[in-house]
């Protein structure tokens, strides 16, 4: 085993599953040994998929690190050549532009600061961070919980310097999941801290919206949608759809069906600045979805 991962903010285990699918010369090269999440349902799901990992249903800010350190020592003894990776998919809601003009939770925006005690206790070889692009704009908030424009990015840069002070170098990239064969288009910040002379390597792009001889075309979400499941017709409803929902469907009919297509997506927050709805198609990757289900596939 080349890499041993500790997954903070592990959720139901998407990152952990990706880590353990990694292969080097057709052999598994990475293993998730421990994970932390405050949500018991997320941990239950993670444990079902990764039963060999040590699970902590705790807030990362208050977790007693002694059991984690003890477990890590045992894993290091079993895999003495393995490098230790601390992965943190920091809570992103209060950085994201999807938050709009709403106030931010100042406490949530400081979760990255709580990584320092993990760094000191674990001394990882690598630290890998995933978040929304706006993480780089992290700065102070005013009395109303709104970002102060003149302080944009100051907290982020200060945090970077603090992590570097532990002997790490740092690189980051903004990567789109669709560029790596996913059925969704989602841009995210990925940052890698590496100790000493350890290399920092990002994956090579495999797909593109405009492919060439080296890159494949983006994958169409149509390929993973079950159009045999017709759902419920919008006609004959006890309560008719509101006008905004009908306008979103109408926009898709005009954009796609009038042009000969038989299916399209309806997205809740799809209105442009000009006040027009822009329906996504099914021949492209799915646009970003959120925890509440405001994305639908429509077939004529």
Describe the function of each predicted region.
Residues 110-193:
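Conserved Class I SAM-dependent methyltransferase catalytic core
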Residues 90-91, 124, 132, 183, ...:
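Proline-centered helix-kink/hinge sites
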Residues 58-60, 177, 291:
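Active-site donor-binding loop signature of nucleotide-sugar glycosyltransferases
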Residues 2-122, 132-150:
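Core alpha/beta nucleotide-donor-binding catalytic domains of modification enzymes
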Residues 74-78, 177-179, 274-277:
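Short, P/G- and charge-enriched loop/turn segments at secondary-structure junctions
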Residues 1-32, 162-169, 184-299:
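S-adenosyl-L-methionine-dependent DNA methyltransferase catalytic core
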């Amino acid at each position: 085993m080349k890499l041993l991962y500790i997954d903070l903010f592990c959720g139901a285990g998407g990152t952990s599953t990706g880590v353990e699918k990694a292969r080097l010369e057709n052999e598994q090269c990475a293993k998730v040994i421990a994970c932390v999440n405050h949500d018991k349902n997320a941990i239950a799901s993670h444990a079902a998929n990764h039963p060999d990992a040590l699970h902590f249903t705790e807030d990362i800010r208050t977790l007693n690190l002694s059991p984690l350190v003890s477990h890590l020592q045992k894993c290091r003894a079993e895999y003495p050549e393995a490098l230790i990776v601390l992965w943190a998919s920091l809570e992103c809601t209060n950085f994201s532009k999807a938050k709009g003009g709403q106030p931010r939770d100042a406490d949530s925006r400081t979760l990255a600061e709580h990584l320092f005690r993990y760094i000191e206790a674990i001394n990882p070889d690598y630290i890998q961070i995933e978040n929304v692009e706006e993480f780089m704009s992290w700065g102070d908030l005013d009395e109303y919980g709104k970002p102060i424009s003149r302080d944009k990015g100051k907290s982020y840069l200060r945090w970077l310097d603090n992590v570097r002070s532990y002997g790490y170098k740092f690189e980051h990239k903004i990567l789109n999941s669709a560029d790596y064969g996913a059925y969704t288009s989602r841009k995210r910040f990925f940052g890698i801290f590496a100790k000493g002379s350890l290399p920092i390597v990002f994956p090579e792009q495999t797909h593109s919206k405009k492919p060439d001889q080296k890159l494949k075309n983006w994958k169409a979400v149509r390929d993973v949608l079950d159009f045999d499941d017709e759902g419920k017709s919008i006609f004959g409803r006890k309560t008719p759809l509101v006008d905004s929902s009908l306008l979103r469907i109408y926009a898709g009919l005009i954009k796609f069906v009038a042009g000969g297509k038989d299916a399209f997506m309806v997205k809740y927050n799809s209105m442009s600045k000009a006040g027009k709805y822009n329906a996504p198609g099914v021949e492209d990757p799915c646009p970003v979805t959120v925890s509440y289900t405001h994305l639908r596939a429509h077939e004529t």
